[in-house]
Amino acid sequence: MHVFPNALIQFAMLGFAIAGVAAVTALGYQSMAPTGQWFGRAFCGLPLGSKQIALTFDDGPNDPHTLNLLEVLAKHNVHATFFLIGKYARQRPDIAQAIAKNGHVIGNHTFTHPLLTVQPNSRIRRQILDCRNAITGAVGEHSNLFRPPWGGRRPGTFRIIRELGLEPIMWNVTGYDWNAPSAEFIEQKVSRKIRAGDVVLLHDGSHAAFGADRSKTVQATDRLIAKYKNEGYDFVTIPEMMRRVTIV
């Protein structure tokens, strides 16, 4: 069959267009995917088989729900990892101090929670440093853990993070608790994904406003800990889970 040259050109252009769309789609997915590793290594859990769960809470400190959550964790003798928004840590250093005094790990979640995929490098650096200063002002020395807001990153983001001496932390299970209709909804979302060695993302606050209602998250956390402790799981902090990687 004779194919005219202009048809060949059209086919080639179509192929390039499809490939371009696929590449952009893949890059977009990887920029937000919690377990994606294209833009740099980030810890998001252990291999299957480890009966450990690391509970992590973003967007605090928040009154009264962070304090209520601390009571639940203390009741079960569980320690967790909290990624704090710097402006809230500066607003309520007393709650940040309560987190630290109860033996939990505190990490950096930027100062105002911007989407880092659309921020210039200078603003990314400033957000991280301002958050670090706010947390240090509240509790003093704290961990070098960092979680990007919404998990968003792009090429170069993790380079800046590591230049500042921070370790990027993502997750592989979430309770979708930012707009959950009930505690049962959160519990079901988490339970469907738990496989052992998981980093669970929950929220004790909200980037949108201080004082957000996270009572459902507090209730779900209570139930999840009871459920998985009964099944023989250990609840650990992110640093404790990461040490397991160096041992295994």
Task: Give the residues covered by each predicted segment.
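N-terminal pre-catalytic segment of deacetylase/amide-hydrolase enzymes
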Residues: 1-55, 62-77, 91-94, 222-226, ...
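Active-site beta->alpha N-cap acidic-glycine motif
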Residues: 31-117, 123, 127-130, 134, ...
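Short, well-ordered coil/turn segments that N-cap beta-strands
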Residues: 50-53, 76-80, 102-104, 140-144, ...
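Charged helix-capping and loop-helix junction motifs
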Residues: 97, 121-128, 183-188, 214-221
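A short acidic, helix-capping loop that chelates divalent metal ions and anchors anionic groups
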Residues: 114-119, 207-211
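His/Asp/Glu-enriched short active-site or ligand-binding loop at hydrolase and phosphoryl-transfer sites
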Residues: 152, 158-194, 233-244
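Catalytic grooves of carbohydrate-active enzymes
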Residues: 191-239
